[in-house]
Curated annotation (Swiss-Prot):
Tissue: Expressed in epididymis (at protein level).
PROSITE patterns the UniProt entry points to: FBOX, WD_REPEATS_1, WD_REPEATS_2, WD_REPEATS_REGION
Alphabetical list of SMART domains matching this protein: Beta-TrCP_D (SM01028), FBOX (SM00256), WD40 (SM00320)
Record note on domains: The N-terminal D domain mediates homodimerization.
GO molecular function terms attached to this record: beta-catenin binding; ligase activity; protein dimerization activity; protein phosphorylated amino acid binding; ubiquitin ligase activator activity; ubiquitin protein ligase activity; ubiquitin-like ligase-substrate adaptor activity
UniProt keyword Transmembrane helix present: no
Residue ranges of every copy of the F-box domain listed in the record: 190-228
Pathway(s) per entry: Protein modification; protein ubiquitination
Full protein name: F-box/WD repeat-containing protein 1A
Length: 605
């Protein structure tokens, strides 16, 4: 660097150091804007390209001896004005020239056409009075008001070149930054620092720990890894299920005990990548078809076949062809209770924390106490087999082989009244589903009909299947249906458009369920297929990539299935119930543990 520029730069920095912090921001913003107003440094020539329409400049001192800055006897403002004039008026003396004499300020090189010029860095002689004048200038500077100081420094910066602006800007930037995470605990505000960091995701939290010892202490004392895991468990069913199945949920959502006998932050930090590894393993198992399998043999004495089922973590409730409802312990796979009363096959069922409601080929709907197995109510309305039913929030919808749909009001298990009968299908209504907005029904007449839930008025018909429709699920705007034309169709319920046709089953698609990630279907060909729902909703995805895996274990028609993030539970004409576990794959457990490949990038869908 040119010696003269070095001296000027040093002087400017010392002025900055003498300024109060409240002035730095204004000076930094000015320095940021100056490159577009002043000149650019040309590294190829070592020269400064001026953007000013200036003629050949004269020596700043005009050959005169350096002038001394003498304190005014008037007000501080007069002192400021006097010094500013000395520093900024080329006709008197600039601050740089009084501090550092120059012999040649500008050397101008004319080009052939004489229209442009290059300014060569100034060559200066150091003044013997530099230190004295600098101290005097700083003394005046300290006496001025903040607004006068800012104005003076702005004028000073405006006289500098592009390189000096950049250097001053880089000098000021660290001064304008504050480590608030370190500063807050010093003022007794640890909880605020912890709360700020608690919004970080895992990757950012890991990086925050490495900033410094104080950040690591805040992260550790605030138990931020524990809070991150708790946040994921509250908002994501996959994490919630893992907490229950792996047992680490017992360490969450508890205040630190008085004796301090609780897992440290390091326990939760080490737990997080293990959870991510479990999630990756589950996803990989779904895609590759790796699973452990448990089989329940229903051992029906007369007619064999399990037509319907529903499960939770403790039990499986199944409806059988032999007219019974059997309740199984999900852990021991033993039959805990058998409910009898129907005189025909149990074709459909649903239960909640209070009741089990079943529909049968005997044309009745029966209500049972889920805890005692006592029959509480019998509804007689349909004149043929009740093929499907759904209930929720005090409302039940049933459908029948008699081509009708019945809408019921449920005040209590013993007080269920018929509200409305919906007609319009020209064949047996095989399946219904509903939410607060729509009732959706599918029939052997090849159509799906949509009805208004509140008014029970008809809304629209979805056409597309070439044969009767056997199964359906509806959620949000999406309807997924399976048909005896061996296809699965995805529909937008609002506009009635068919979004995708899935082909792959060889016989009637008898049952279908979907969640946010995948569709699982079962068919009369004895196969269960897993489909990528996200890809299926993308019109650019090739049809051949949509089926992730085909599972073949049943020896008869697949009648019903249900699934969650960890498992599929299915029933079949072969009189068995199969539990397909994608979390606890024996082959994967035999392998040595591996590091998760996306330890801090899990995204919930």
């Amino acid at each position: 660097m040119d010696p003269a520029e070095a001296v000027l730069q040093e002087k400017a920095l010392k002025f900055m150091c003498s300024m109060p912090r409240s002035l730095w921001l204004g000076c930094s913003s000015l320095a940021d804007s100056m490159p577009s107003l002043r000149c650019l440094y040309n590294p190829g020539t070592g020269a400064l390209t001026a953007f000013q329409n200036s003629s050949e400049r004269e020596d700043c001192n005009n050959g005169e001896p350096p002038r001394k800055i003498i304190p005014e006897k008037n007000s501080l403002r007069q002192t400021y004005n006097s010094c500013a004039r000395l520093c900024l008026n080329q006709e008197t003396v600039c601050l740089a020239s009084t501090a550092m004499k120059t012999e040649n300020c500008v050397a101008k090189t004319k080009l052939a056409n004489g229209t442009s010029s290059m300014i060569v860095p100034k060559q200066r002689k150091l003044s013997a009075s530099y230190e004295k004048e600098k101290e005097l200038c700083v003394k005046y500077f300290e006496q001025w008001s903040e607004s006068d100081q800012v104005e003076f420094v702005e004028h000073l910066i405006s006289q500098m070149c592009h390189y000096q602006h950049g250097h001053i800007n880089s000098y000021l930037k660290p001064m304008l930054q504050r480590d608030f995470i370190t500063a807050l605990p010093a003022r007794g505000l640890d909880h605020i620092a912890e709360n700020i960091l608690s919004y970080l995701d895992a990757k950012s939290l890991c990086a925050a720990e490495l900033v410094c010892k104080e950040w690591y202490r805040v992260t550790s004392d605030g138990m931020l890894w524990k809070k991150l895991i708790e946040r994921m468990v509250r908002t994501d069913s996959l994490w919630r299920g893992l907490a229950e199945r792996r047992g680490w949920g017992q360490y969450l959502f508890k205040n630190k005990p008085p004796d301090g006998n609780a897992p440290p932050n390091s326990f939760y930090r080490a737990l997080y990548p293990k959870i991510i590894q479990d999630i990756e393993t589950i996803e990989s198992n779904w895609r590759c078809g790796r699973h452990s399998l448990q089989r329940i043999h229903c051992r029906s004495e007369t007619s064999k076949g399990v037509y319907c089922l529903q499960y939770d973590d403790q039990k499986i409730v199944s409806g059988l062809r032999d007219n019974t409802i059997k309740i199984w312990d999900k852990n021991t796979l033993e039959c805990k209770r058998i409910l009898t009363g129907h005189t025909g096959s149990v074709l459909c069922l649903q239960y909640d924390e209070r009741v089990i409601i079943t529909g049968s080929s005997d044309s009745t709907v029966r209500v049972w106490d889920v805890n005692t197995g006592e029959m509480l109510n019998t509804l007689i309305h349909h004149c043929e087999a009740v093929l499907h039913l759904r209930f929720n929030n005090g409302m039940m919808v049933t459908c029948s082989k008699d081509r009708s749909i019945a809408v019921w009001d449920m005040a209590s298990p013993t007080d269920i009244t018929l509200r409305r009968v919906l007609v319009g299908h020209r064949a047996a209504v095989n399946v219904v589903d509903f939410d607060d907005k729509y009732i959706v029904s599918a029939s052997g007449d090849r159509t799906i009909k949509v009805w208004n839930t509140s008014t029970c008025e008809f809304v629209r018909t979805l056409n597309g299947h070439k044969r009767g429709i056997a199964c359906l699920q509806y959620r949000d705007r999406l309807v997924v249906s399976g048909s005896s034309d061996n296809t699965i169709r995805l529909w937008d319920i609002e506009c009635g458009a068919c979004l995708r046709v899935l082909e792959g089953h060889e016989e009637l698609v008898r049952c279908i369920r979907f969640d946010n990630k995948r569709i699982v279907s079962g068919a009369y060909d004895g196969k269960i297929k897993v489909w990528d729902l996200v890809a299926a909703l993308d019109p650019r995805a090739p049809a051949g990539t949509l089926c992730l895996r085909t599972l073949v274990e049943h020896s008869g028609r697949v009648f019903r299935l249900q699934f969650d993030e960890f498992q599929i539970v299915s029933s079949s004409h072969d009189d068995t119930i199969l539990i397909w576990d994608f979390l606890n794959d024996p082959a994967a457990q035999a392998e040595p543990p591996r590091s998760p490949s996306r330890t801090y990038t899990y995204i919930s869908r």
